[in-house]
A protein has these predicted regions:
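Assembly/oligomerization scaffold segments
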Residues: 1-126
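Charged- and aromatic-enriched interaction segments used to assemble
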Residues: 103-179
Length: 179
């Protein structure tokens, strides 16, 4: 009989890509992995714990522009992988490499903290304008025109009524406007 736990998954791929478009598969180096999605936060975040014997921080030319692609599939049945609808394939941006511990002369362990790439643009960009229309049209306007998020990335969009609201946005970050 197989010993199964709720929420088990298969890591299909975890790859690290630097600003020079060089990519390395790091899924075999992972010792811990957490991905967070909250109804109280606007962005997905993740953290990866791994042991590095290749000295990736130096040899892979870390500069703060790295991306990590995480692809996982849920476990369904006995040892079977879920279809693509029930899987996660997401790109994150590395915003912190921390908790560095040297294990021996050639090996170190550390944590990469990751966030949704849109978090950077929404926290950096400020908006000053007057918006008119329904709340959903105002939000979509800001996300598409100012945050440069293509409408194809919206998984779900609900229309709101009435359509005759007016809002003044006084030099707010896009993240504050979303709240």
């Amino acid at each position: 009989m197989e010993n199964r736990k709720a929420g088990e998954f298969f890591i299909t791929s975890i790859s690290l890509t630097n600003q020079h478009k060089e990519s390395v598969e790091i899924s075999k180096l992972i010792t811990g992995f957490r991905m967070y999605e909250s109804i109280f936060k606007k962005y997905c975040t993740a953290e990866i714990h791994f042991i590095d014997g290749l000295n990736l921080i130096k040899n892979f030319r870390f500069t703060g522009q790295e991306y990590v692609r995480i692809a996982v599939k849920m476990k369904v049945g006995i040892g079977e992988k879920a279809d693509n609808l029930d899987s996660v394939d997401k790109v994150f941006r590395v915003y912190k490499a921390g908790s560095v511990k040297r294990l021996n002369d050639t090996t170190q362990a550390y944590v990469l903290n990751l966030c949704d790439p849109h978090m950077f643009s929404c926290e950096r960009k400020r908006v000053s304008k007057v918006l008119r229309g329904s709340y959903d049209k105002m939000l979509q306007n800001i996300l598409v025109e100012d945050a440069k998020i293509p409408p194809s990335e919206f998984d779900q969009w609900e229309s709101t009524v009435p359509e005759n609201h007016q809002m003044i946005v006084p030099n707010w970050k896009i993240s504050k406007f979303i709240d």
